[in-house]
């Protein structure tokens, strides 16, 4: 009876996925057409990713159907239940249009993140403390939530993930974060709120604030840091793009169009001295650079630690 029930449940899950396939293919086609009309290199890359995810989804559905195709062999196959769970979970992952972070969901399934800060090794690169026991953590611009879940795993008693631009985007959305949180059985909280709307009254004050890959997207970076300072109780970890490394005084490059990575949402590339000055003007102290990567010409990525 138990074996039959398990098979029925899994078969129903497969049928549910198959019913969604037609709608998913339509959504894939609509999104692809919209991105192709945009015609930018960034959009072209997204089209390539969408195509890969669509192929993966079709492949997983086919593999799962084949798994149940021979009734006489199903009992033996059920002995390897994690393989079935992996197939079903992979199918869910493939339904998410765009993944930014690589998140280990278990069962051998890792989300296909394409972001520059998307691998587990970056926990060390940003200097995330080994233990966050008893601490509260705010992850600003969380996207898929990789760092939010990492903070939770390190013992944080409360983690709040916030985002607005990505989560409210019709082409990306919040699905990746919600899927990862459900599968990981995470208690991470979430709030859709813009950086410039952060305040102690709206979100509270946190021992540790993560501002990773966000600052250069801000049209008003100084105001953004003021808002971040207001909700920082102890420490800020800031990761950002920097430019004008050849300038020996505080300076920042301004990107009025698509100069940086052909992305119109990138606005400023301050050099390290400018970042330090901006953090100090917001009220932070004891500011230091803890990591530099992807250096190219006058540009790089840098991680700063600062305290209140």
Q: Where are the language model's segments positioned?
A:
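Conserved SAM-binding site of S-adenosyl-L-methionine-dependent methyltransferases, i.e.
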Residues: 215
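Active-site flanking residues adjacent to catalytic metal/cofactor-binding acidic residues
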Residues: 138, 162, 212, 238-239
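Conserved N-terminal segment of class I S-adenosyl-L-methionine
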Residues: 6-11, 15-17, 26, 34, ...
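Short, contiguous strand/loop micro-motifs
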Residues: 113, 134-136, 211-212, 261-263
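S-adenosyl-L-methionine-dependent methyltransferase catalytic module, highlighting the catalytic core
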Residues: 196-202, 206, 210-211, 219-308
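Short, Lys/Arg-enriched N-terminal segments with co-localized hydrophobic residues
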Residues: 1-2
